[in-house]
């Protein structure tokens, strides 16, 4: 399931990047503005996130499709070491398969220089700034997921919030770091485009940012972990992860434990 979700995510990234940036794309003459293309890319990938979360696979597996997310839930006690390892391996292999399928379906178009397999690469400010940016946006994304998914009211909107952040990040942050927040998202294109020089950024910064978010989450909640490891609890699929306490009606109540 996680392999399929990561594959869909990377297939969508390659297909949208080809549509928006390939010189032979029929929409190229109508989209000369780079900022507009990034906004459309963000909207497309945000909708992709929503679609993945709401599939039967996403409802069952939790819709991580990101080794950094899986590592964070392992840290929070929701997953066993073996489950986390298999999840991560599936996500990485799925990302590779997604890029391969996009290349096959689109007859090699994602390899074009302007598209470069929808790779996530450091922007104009260099590797150091890209690392910091990836850590920050990953911290914000995981903080939003953890706090909303464990709130009785807001948990219904966690997947919408996560998708919205992805869309905003791609539209406005991608010139800085390429916008990954996901080692698998970067790994798939890197395999085919041989983009190795900055791979370490995307394998280190997102996990560090998300793990930092988990520490803040635990601190605010007085050490109480999350209910489940899903982005969408309100469905007919049982939680396959280690259960936590019931959803909090108010985050403020749990924060009283550290007062």
For each feature predicted by the language model, list its residue ranges.
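Membrane-interface helix-loop junctions and terminal tails of multi-pass membrane proteins
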Residues: 1-259
């Amino acid at each position: 399931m996680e392999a399929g979700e990561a594959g869909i995510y990377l297939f969508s990234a390659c297909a949208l990047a080809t549509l928006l940036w390939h010189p032979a794309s029929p929409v190229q003459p109508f989209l000369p503005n780079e900022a507009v293309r990034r906004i459309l890319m963000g909207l497309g990938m945000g909708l992709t996130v929503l679609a993945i979360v709401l599939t039967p696979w996403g409802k069952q597996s939790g819709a991580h499709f990101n080794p950094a997310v899986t590592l964070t839930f392992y840290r929070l006690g929701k997953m066993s070491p073996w489950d986390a390892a298999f999840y991560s391996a599936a996500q990485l292999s799925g990302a590779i398969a997604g890029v391969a399928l996009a290349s096959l379906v689109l007859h090699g178009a994602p390899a074009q220089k302007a598209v470069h397999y929808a790779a996530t690469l450091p922007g104009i400010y260099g590797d150091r700034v890209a690392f910091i940016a990836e850590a920050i946006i990953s911290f914000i994304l995981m903080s939003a997921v953890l706090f909303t998914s464990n709130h009785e009211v807001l948990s219904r909107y966690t997947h919408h919030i996560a998708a919205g952040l992805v869309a905003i990040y791609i539209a406005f942050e991608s010139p800085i770091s390429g916008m990954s927040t996901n080692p698998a998202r970067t790994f798939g294109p890197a395999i085919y485009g041989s983009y190795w020089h900055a791979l370490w950024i995307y394998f280190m910064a997102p996990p560090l940012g998300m793990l930092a978010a988990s520490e803040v989450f635990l601190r605010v909640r007085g050490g109480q972990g999350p209910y489940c490891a899903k982005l969408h609890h309100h469905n007919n699929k049982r939680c396959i992860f280690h259960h936590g306490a019931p959803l909090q009606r108010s985050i403020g109540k749990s924060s009283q434990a550290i007062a």
